[in-house]
Amino acid sequence: MIYAGILAGGTGTRMGISNLPKQFLELGDRPILIHTIEKFVLEPSIEKIVVGVHGDWVSHAEDLVDKYLPLYKERIIITKGGADRNTSIKKIIEAIDAYRPLTPEDIVVTHDSVRPFITLRMIQDNIQLAQNHDAVDTVVEAVDTIVESTNGQFITDIPNRAHLYQGQTPQTFRCKDFVDLYGSLSDEEKEILTDACKIFVIKGKDVALAKGEYSNLKITTVTDLKIAKSMIEKD
C-alpha cells in the first residue's frame, strides 16, 4: 500500500501575525494545511493520508478536514505527532499500522505541511522511484553559491555547486525500513540526525533523487507567506 504522511506537528507562531501555528494560517480561501492535503487527495494510489499534528491541535485539524474536505475525510487520518520530525514520522507509521498491519512493501510519502505547492508529478515520481530504491529525496539544483564556515566568521570551503542540491520534500521510503533504521540509532544519533533521508544515507542505503520544483516553497517566514499569497492569486 501507498500512504501519505503529512508533517504538521509544529506549534511555532514566530511569524507574529497570528496565534495559530503556521500550517493553519489562511492562504487564499483556506488554511495552508488544507491546500497541502488536497494535493495528495488527487493521487488515487494513496490509500490513506495521515496527518501528524501536535496533540493540542488534533481537534482543530479534524474540524478543518470536516469543513473543507468533507468528501475525502474517510481517506484522511489525523493523529498525534511526536516531539520532533522523525518521531512524528514514527507516530504516523504507527497510525498506519493501527489502520492496517504493516507489510514490508508499504510505502509512506512524507511531506511538510507548509509546502502547499507540491505537484502531482512530484508525488508520482516519488512513488515510482520508491518501488526500486531504499528511499527517495526530492531536490532542486543549488542556484546560489554555497559557502561553508566552521566558525561562523570565515569561509572554510566553497563546494562545487554542480554537485549540490537543495533538499525539499516529499521524502519517501518503506515504513518498516524507517522504523528499523530509526530504532537502530543511539540517543545521540537521534538528536543529530533530524533528516529521515540522512538516516538512510549513513546506514548505507541508496537514496534516489526526485526532481523538485523551485515553486515548492516552504512557508516559514512572513516573507514566505507573502510570496505564497502572490502565487495563489496568480493561480
From Swiss-Prot:
InterPro entries in UniProt: IspD/TarI, IspD/TarI_cytidylyltransf_bact, ISPD_synthase_CS, Nucleotide-diphossugar_trans, TarI
Marked site (Transition state stabilizer) residue numbers: R14, K22
Reactions catalysed, as given in the entry: D-ribitol 5-phosphate + CTP + H(+) = CDP-L-ribitol + diphosphate
Enzyme class: transferase
Domain of life: Bacteria
Gene: tarI
UniProt pathway: Cell wall biogenesis; poly(ribitol phosphate) teichoic acid biosynthesis
Protein family membership: Belongs to the IspD/TarI cytidylyltransferase family. TarI subfamily.
Protein's GO biological process: cell wall organization; isoprenoid biosynthetic process; poly(ribitol phosphate) teichoic acid biosynthetic process
Function: Catalyzes the transfer of the cytidylyl group of CTP to D-ribitol 5-phosphate.
Protein name (Swiss-Prot/TrEMBL): Ribitol-5-phosphate cytidylyltransferase
Binding site for CTP: L7, A8, G9, G10, G82, A83, D84, R85, N86, T87, S88, S113
Enzyme nomenclature, EC number: 2.7.7.40
Keywords in alphabetical order: Cell wall biogenesis/degradation, Nucleotidyltransferase, Teichoic acid biosynthesis, Transferase
Taxonomic source organism: Streptococcus pneumoniae (strain Hungary19A-6)
Matching PROSITE patterns: ISPD
UniProt-listed Gene3D superfamilies: Spore Coat Polysaccharide Biosynthesis Protein SpsA, Chain A
One of the Pfam families matching this protein, by short name: IspD
Site residues (Positions ribitol 5-phosphate for the nucleophilic attack), renumbered to this chain: R161, K218
Molecular function terms, GO-annotated: 2-C-methyl-D-erythritol 4-phosphate cytidylyltransferase activity; D-ribitol-5-phosphate cytidylyltransferase activity
